[in-house]
Amino acid sequence: HWKPLFLVAFTATFFPGFFFAFAVSQIDSSVSAILNSLTPLITMLIGFFFFGFSFSRRQVFGVFVGLVGTLLLIVKSAEINPHQHYEYALLIFLSSIGYAYSLNMIKTKLSDLDALSITVSCFAVLMLPALLVLVFSGFFNDLVWTSKASESLFYVSLLAIVGTAMAKVLFNRLVQIS
């Protein structure tokens, strides 16, 4: 299971985290959220073409309605904010592809593992790369160790561990039972 876990870890967590951070520095977060709503459509397309899934007409219609809404919101946003760097939207699109790919991988290749095992394994795979990014980003050099900074770091860490990890466990379980 390590190969699918490795792929799921990087496509669903590692790269999208950075892609979103870079993208929202250049485009509105609302645009990134709208673009991220393409994930169900991309999930269906990847599932159909690469994993052999079939879908009901109702499912396809629902995703199509969502796509039309997404396109309308993107066009309106571009009219309202024409001076943004919309080429960064490609990073959001790549994240959606990563999410879609990982959803299909969890459903097909990791369905025999429980959701907690998938989550723990993915975060274990990402520990070293994430630590390397943290070290080489200058985080430890730039951090001023005060009581407020330590407290803030504690709460961010708590949010990451409790919020993100628990959400990933629940999400992985929902993917498995869908």
Feature locations, PLM:
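Structural signature of hydrophobic alpha-helical transmembrane segments
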Residues: 22-40, 85-98, 151-161
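Membrane-interface helix caps of multi-pass small-molecule transporters
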Residues: 18, 22, 26, 45-54, ...
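Hydrophobic transmembrane alpha-helices of multi-pass small-molecule transport proteins
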Residues: 46, 55-77, 96, 130
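Specific transmembrane alpha-helical segments of multi-pass solute transporters/efflux pumps
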Residues: 1-36, 72, 160-178
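Hydrophobic alpha-helical transmembrane segments in multi-pass integral membrane proteins
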Residues: 15-22, 71-81, 126-142
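Hydrophobic alpha-helical transmembrane segments of multi-pass integral membrane proteins
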Residues: 7, 58-68, 87-91, 105-162
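Residues that define the loop-to-transmembrane-helix transition and helix capping
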Residues: 3, 30, 56, 116-117
